[in-house]
Amino acid sequence: SIDVTIIEPNEHYYTCYFSNEVISGERKMDSIKFGYDGLKARGINVVQAAAEMIDAEAKTVKAGGKDYPFDRCIVAPGVEMIYDKIEGYSAEVAEKLPHGWKAGKQTEILRDQLAGVKEGGTAVIVAPPNPFRCPPGPYERASQFAGYFKHHNPTAKVIILDSKQKFSKQGLFTQGWEKFYGYGTDDSRIEGQPGPDTAVVRVDADA
């Protein structure tokens, strides 16, 4: 038998899986919310604190003012936004211009903004350059936006700004877009703007 300890600062988490369906109103936030009670019930020690330091020599992790010894340590820090890559963007601005890469509050902001797009309005999605987490993500989200508009705001559209010439699963996405959203026609609900000239270098949340 082994003794397993998970050190995690958050009491619960929201899955990125199915978050698109929350954004389009097909799911509730609670359906993608999970805690750690199931792990606790299986004998796993869950410490609700942030890891502050790892001492590889002493084989300890400091969290919440305590040291936790280990034989093996697996570090899973997740991802963080690199806000300073785009002039004018920050964690504060993300409250107005959501990136949506982390499920939770960002999901709710994006859901509310999608529902608030005016009739005939435009939603802009910026696909980051490679490498980044979940390469199909921006195009999945564009598909979900277009599906929402088709049923709730049929004159609205989605524009994808993408500095890449090619993207993950491109053939499958364009095939679906052509079939369901008129991609490539004058009435397309999705417009792609590929190439280095569409790389986003600055945003103005107040413009």
Please report, for each region that a protein language model flagged, where it lies by residue:
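Beta1-alpha1 glycine-rich phosphate/pyrophosphate-binding loop at the start
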Residues: 1-45, 129-172
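Conserved N-terminal glycine/acidic-rich loop preference
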Residues: 7, 12-27, 105-112, 118-123, ...
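Short, surface-exposed, polar/charged, turn-prone segments marking secondary-structure boundaries
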Residues: 31-36, 75, 100-104, 151-154, ...
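Alpha-helix boundary recognition
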Residues: 37-41, 115, 178
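A Rossmann-like FAD-binding core segment of flavoenzymes
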Residues: 42-53, 58-61, 68, 146-207
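FAD-binding core/adjacent interface of flavoenzyme oxidoreductases
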Residues: 46-140, 144-151
